[in-house]
Amino acid sequence: MAEAVNVSPMGGEQRADGAAQKLLVIDTTYTMEAIKVRGIEDSVTCRDLDGFFSHVWSVHPVATLTTSKEWTAPVGKPVHYGLNDRHTFVEGKIGRFPKLRRLFVPNFLLAQLGLMWWLFRLIRRERIAVIRAGDPLYTGLVSWALARLTGIPFVVRVGGNHDKFHEETGQPMMPRLFRRRSVEKRVERFVFRRADLVAGANQDNLNFALANGAVHDRATVFRYGNLIDRRHFVAPASRDGGADACARLGVEPGRFLLYIGRLEPVKRPQDVVRVLGHLHGQGHRLKALFLGDGTMKAEMAALGEDLGVGADMIFAGSVDQGILAQLIPQCAAVVSPHTGRALSEAALGGAPIAAYDIDWQGELIKSQVTGELVPYGDAPALAEATARFVSDKAYAERMGEAARAAALEMLDPDMLDEHERSMYRKLLAKSR
């Protein structure tokens, strides 16, 4: 029998007993420091689904693994931040007591057990309706344990294809915690099989989950659209400040390639350097602007020097979403070896995109329809695809417009919000 849905005075939907629905998200994607630096608060505050949940607690259980010491002490009690009336962000720490700093493992366990106990009490006190994990590994295990202890359903969102990551790098996703990929595979199957709902960020990520134990009739896709800053949905021609943003970063409108993402091996940013070298060899004097941080910066700079393009490479680090939205329409092309949400932002900005056929990129980029898609790892083909945009401005403009149209259809945030709400309604109805 269909369940009637009530709306509480606070704006969130109500349970059968009249209480507003509340959500707990356990996710390690971003720390509060990274959220503030990049201006991506929308990626957290969207989790209430436009008031479907009256309050959302977003918890990063091991935030101080990656935060700077200037931001917060690495050990101690969890830190709480109020984003607005509906959202609380909690950062767990990698140790509980400063005096045990040298005993990392026991101190880590004390911190995590303390956080688990706090979350257990939070679920009971606030009558949280559902738990959502950000991955099928550590946060998936924590979410499963809390769900079992409290009797509420849990959802796993899958934001990557871990099998392909291992194939590309030979490394496990979380080497410090699980050591080997074989251990991670067992954990993933355990979590996927027990999840009440598995949601891939795209079809490729969902296919990975289905191949590793997720149940078909408890699986769906929650795309990136409602996680994206609304400034990226503004028509490119209506975005002010692009020329000024270019000037501040040392590039000229229409005279630079753009890479958005982490400078890490799995993302293959070094291939963008090779693309730049190829274009210089053809006489195209462009620069390459890299927006993101990571361990490969020095290696990429050295490669640029070897190829004679080092002086035309700009490493700008992470930038605010407002600046990013200004920059995208100004570039000659976006080069996307392997990106996630950044590919959505690039397409919404109407940029011509040259991409590898990896992960979900082929779902959005179709060769000569919405951009150029080439075999994964084929840097010469990626360079030729990019060169086509640089040499044929009219073609580049057509591909950029087509990419934006496809992204607007695929990533409509209102449509995606409603899809997520409908899946949560079904899930919560089954749990009663």
Which sequence ranges carry the predicted segments?
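Short alpha-helical donor nucleotide-sugar binding micro-motif in glycosyltransferases
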Residues: 192, 318-319, 325-331, 346
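Conserved donor-binding/catalytic core segment of Leloir-type glycosyltransferases
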Residues: 24, 251-267, 273-276
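Donor nucleotide-sugar binding/catalytic pocket of nucleotide-sugar-dependent glycosyltransferases
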Residues: 178-240, 251, 315
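N-terminal subdomain of nucleotide-sugar transferases
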Residues: 1-81
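Acidic donor-binding loop of glycosyltransferase active sites
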Residues: 328-339, 351-352
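Conserved acidic donor-binding segment of nucleotide-sugar-dependent glycosyltransferases
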Residues: 367-368, 372-379, 388-394
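Nucleotide-activated donor-binding/catalytic signature segment of Leloir-type glycosyltransferases, i.e.
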Residues: 298-319
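Membrane-proximal helix-turn-helix segments that form the acceptor-binding/catalytic region
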Residues: 44-48, 120-121, 141, 145-149, ...
